[in-house]
């Protein structure tokens, strides 16, 4: 059982640095300049400052603009906004100007003061779309994080991608491996223990209630959900031997996909029609990534790089994985590849880079970076060739999903 858990659990330290974002730019592309103007008249100075900083960071992370403080307004974009607060309700008006004329205007209302980061993210996402620039539809999506709270106890929290907003959703006992259950992010799956037996639950965020899906001896973890949310890939070990299973939520039918005497875990759908699955296996004597058709039990090796590839995430025909570097002690880097090509792209350069997860549009990858005694949540903008880091102040991370 210890060997099974070891391939899943990686515990990270906490970062206490003060920088809200570190921008690593690997491209010399000249971007249009944009000026941020805050016309708000808020008495809450902390909210005013934090909201402004999030807007600026969002515009940077979008990789569509160069944010400048002092420039000629007539020759650059202007992001002009007014934020108002009335009790627990926020209202926001945003105008995008260029060349002295309005290019777009949006008005938003939010009930729930603590969720103000999502209001900022939504406004930047909509403004980018209105200008016809490279979309950032993932920006207001939520991240699920399982973190240790005390000995043999862990919480599942929901956060925005900057980690400014954090809310505990599931608490009490050992709660592990959260996985979003639909693209609307209204439900997720997670593993907990029911009378010492690993059990998979579904949590409905609309009702704030959890319901039991299935249980198994050894372990049970939901690692992926298909496009329409009707099927799960589940790692189960009813006889202390982990394999990948397909679970149909409509028919309640459970199908074993792998049957290997070693370890097969972390199944992910891949391909435009979800007809294949990639997973991590030790059938070569070390963790590596394999693929097989859903209607076949014949697996083929996918990754021929590295000798410890123990984490994978997929988007259509692409996959990202974390790989231990052979000649660099403790260094794990993230790589991107397609199942239709031999080309592999290295996305990180140093430290321990773990838990890669694709955004909903495949254009960004979130991961956890551990370097020395510090850790951060990283966002890779793949096409822009940029990486942004946000300090982790959430405790020891067990797993994440985006």
Curated annotation (Swiss-Prot):
Keywords: Cell cycle, Cell division, Periplasm, Signal. It comes from the Bacteria. SUPFAM superfamilies: Tricorn protease N-terminal domain. Its main location: periplasm. The Tol-Pal system is composed of five core proteins: the inner membrane proteins TolA, TolQ and TolR, the periplasmic protein TolB and the outer membrane protein Pal. They form a network linking the inner and outer membranes and the peptidoglycan layer. Part of the Tol-Pal system, which plays a role in outer membrane invagination during cell division and is important for maintaining outer membrane integrity. This is Tol-Pal system protein TolB. It comes from Campylobacter jejuni subsp. jejuni serotype O:2 (strain ATCC 700819 / NCTC 11168). The lineage of its organism: Bacteria, Pseudomonadati, Campylobacterota, Epsilonproteobacteria, Campylobacterales.
